Amino acid sequence: MSAADKHIKEIRQGLFALKDEKYKEFQKKLIPTVDENTVIGVRTPVLRKYAKDVSGTPGAVIFMQTLPHEYYEENNLHGMLIETMKDYDECIAYLDEFLPYVDNWATCDLISPRVFKKHKDELLVKIKEWMASDRVYTIRFGMEMLMTHFLDEDFKPEYLGMAADVHSEEYYVNMMIAWFFATALAKQYEASLPYIENRCMDRWTHNKTIQKAIESYRITDEQKRYLKSLKIK
């Protein structure tokens, strides 16, 4: 066995040592795009602690350089290790290597590198690149980063147009568009409302956006009533 294989085996054994059979049964129902035989069953807080322990070790570097992974939790661990990176360029390089292998919404949505907060200008360029991808979860990740970092103090109305310009037949992309605009309505209501009034999205995404928006405590009752009136029958 090579040194690289030994490191990967040790990391995998560590994951299996954290296995929770009941959680596995629960988790595999939430990720229908993932082969249930690849789900170990490690709770997210436990996995995050494991990622913290593994981060910075030679084994972690080898693990991240060895793709594709065999197990769902290995992908999640990979995403969590990327999150801890403090160098922006290194983080982006590892992300671009990893994103093509992301095959489910849960792995996609857990990745939120802290270093992004200090590199907004460069990040916006990458977000546009990710959102122009032909890969479902790369698009979803890019849009989630746009939602996370550019709907508050760094908001510009043009960012709404970036999201509205994404057209897809993929459920997990359209669900992300709905999530984005529901969040935008909560944070930037006046700027976002015309995208609903003018029906800039397909019927399903339009109605899902309204559904998610009216579930938000950040939207007033009056706004919720108006949004309900804009549903496409």
Show which residues each predicted segment covers.
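Alpha-helical scaffold domains
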Residues: 1-233
